[in-house]
Amino acid sequence: MAIRIVGVDLPQNKRGEIALTYVYGIGRSSSAKILDKAGVDKDLKVKDWTDDQAAKIREIIGAEYKVEGDLRSEVQLNIKRLMDIGCYRGVRHRIGLPVRGQSTKNNARTRKGRKKTVANKKKATK
């Protein structure tokens, strides 16, 4: 039986601490805190969780963490706000360049996309 938390099926054969990181917005440290608060051993595999343990974890995540769609929409709204107020970071987002001060002379290919090749000028014939 697959355990579903906030719309994500957790992998059955992984430890609980790792399996919870499949949820967007929960990393290793957050998953360890959640499992401690729920009283579940973090080395216990997901398939060995009881229904009560899964329900307790669901309850903790729902009450204390912003995850999946809510978190994604909040991040998008934050980026949109930066773009609307026209600050430097918003402008960098709008034109698709690195936002955190990285150099763009040579690299930054992830943000800029594939190279746009420029044709050479033809030599003028006399």
From Swiss-Prot:
RNA-binding as UniProt keyword: yes
Gene Ontology CC annotations of this record: cytosol; small ribosomal subunit
Stored Gene3D superfamilies: 1.10.8.50, 30s ribosomal protein s13, domain 2
InterPro entries to which the protein is assigned, alphabetical: Rbsml_uS13_C, Ribosomal_uS13, Ribosomal_uS13-like_H2TH, Ribosomal_uS13_bac-type, Ribosomal_uS13_CS
Biased composition (Basic residues): 108-126
GO MF annotations, alphabetized: rRNA binding; structural constituent of ribosome; tRNA binding
Record keyword tRNA-binding present: yes
Alphabetic keyword roster: Ribonucleoprotein, Ribosomal protein, RNA-binding, rRNA-binding, tRNA-binding
UniProt record, GO biological process: translation
Chain intervals for the UniProt region annotation (Disordered): 98-126
A Pfam family matched in the record: Ribosomal_S13
Function noted in UniProt: Located at the top of the head of the 30S subunit, it contacts several helices of the 16S rRNA. In the 70S ribosome it contacts the 23S rRNA (bridge B1a) and protein L5 of the 50S subunit (bridge B1b), connecting the 2 subunits; these bridges are implicated in subunit movement. Contacts the tRNAs in the A and P-sites.
Subunit structure as annotated in this protein's UniProt entry: Part of the 30S ribosomal subunit. Forms a loose heterodimer with protein S19. Forms two bridges to the 50S subunit in the 70S ribosome.
NCBIfam families cross-referenced by the UniProt entry: uS13_bact
Family classification: Belongs to the universal ribosomal protein uS13 family.
Protein name: Small ribosomal subunit protein uS13
Gene that specifies this protein: rpsM
